[in-house]
A protein has these predicted regions:
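N-terminal pro-sequences and low-complexity stem/linker regions of secreted or lumenal proteins
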Residues: 2-290
Length: 290
């Protein structure tokens, strides 16, 4: 009954307008001028609200699963080294305590692969919805030793553009461009994966994953110096590159800041422990991202 009630609950527009009459943000496009002139959209990775913010009192979270929040204890895989009572993502929590925070997000995606599509306003088609679910369930995977002619590995993350289900009208990039909204992109939709070095390719050499062309509007407004998804690259380096290019492009007043700036900081995805490179725990990636 609750699901049916929620799905078919209709509230008059006048109620929403009345409740938000003192809100400076327009209720809908064209209602009034918005005080927001610039948006910096930062995309992150596979963390849930509760994992980081479950202990935040002003949010509706579950503190019992806030493994990257306050007073966390963790160990390496071999349980030979550990840390007790640490606050892992302290900057995230500080921002949440001092500024606005939103909870109860109900996303359209099931996993990361289709989530990156929704992120840039591309609707996954039937092929994607079935193949990604089968892949994540362990029942369908890419075979790097396949003998199929022209076999390529079409993988993706970082809000990439996928030819198999790209909207006829494009994604948010074309939408911004059509409506005269200036934007600039750091890291979205650009990803070159490493190659396969299996000895079965002794007659051909390395077999590479394939990338695909970016839409013109996005290519022209994308940084060529900002690193995309790769857990071997620290987010600290990404931020340094962002600051450097931000200052050179707009910080010195040469050009006006675009209305929309998109940035990807993906290392909260996590990866295997790399103690020799400063990542002795999986939590180390979260701290780097923080």
């Amino acid at each position: 009954n609750r699901v049916v009630e929620n799905n078919f609950m209709i509230e008059g527009a006048e109620n929403a307008a009345s409740a938000r009459k003192d809100n400076p943000i327009p209720l809908y496009g064209g209602q009034k001028d918005s005080p927001i002139k610039h948006i910096v959209f930062i995309s992150k990775e596979n963390r849930t609200y509760d994992e980081v913010f479950g202990q935040v009192e002003k949010g509706e979270g579950d503190p019992s699963i806030a493994r990257y929040g306050y007073n966390a204890s963790f160990y390496n895989k071999n349980r030979t080294v550990g840390i007790e009572n640490a606050t892992i993502m302290s900057n995230h929590l500080k921002l949440a305590s001092e500024f606005a925070i939103a909870d109860n997000f109900y996303v359209d995606s099931d996993v990361s692969a289709d989530g990156h599509r929704w992120l840039v306003n591309t609707y996954p088609n039937e092929w994607v919805e079935t193949v990604t679910a089968a892949s994540y369930g362990g029942n369908r995977s890419y075979n790097p030793a396949s003998k199929a002619p022209g076999s390529l590995a079409m993988t993706g993350s970082a809000g990439a553009i996928y030819p198999e289900d790209y909207n006829e009208a494009g994604s948010m990039w074309e939408h911004l461009n059509r409506n005269g909204i200036d934007f600039f992109n750091f890291g979205f939709s650009v990803m070159f994966e490493p190659g396969f070095y299996d000895d079965s390719y002794k007659y051909t050499g390395i077999k590479h994953f394939a990338n695909f062309p970016l839409p013109a509007a996005l290519f022209e407004r994308t940084s060529k110096q900002f690193p995309t998804y790769n857990m071997s690259i620290p987010d600290q380096f990404r931020v340094s590159q962002f600051i450097k290019e931000f200052n050179s492009r707009w910080g010195e007043g040469k050009d006006p800041l675009p209305q929309v700036v998109t940035v990807i900081l993906p290392n909260d995805h996590g990866a295997d422990e790399r103690p020799g490179y400063g990542y002795p725990f999986r939590e180390s990636y979260m701290v780097d991202n923080d």
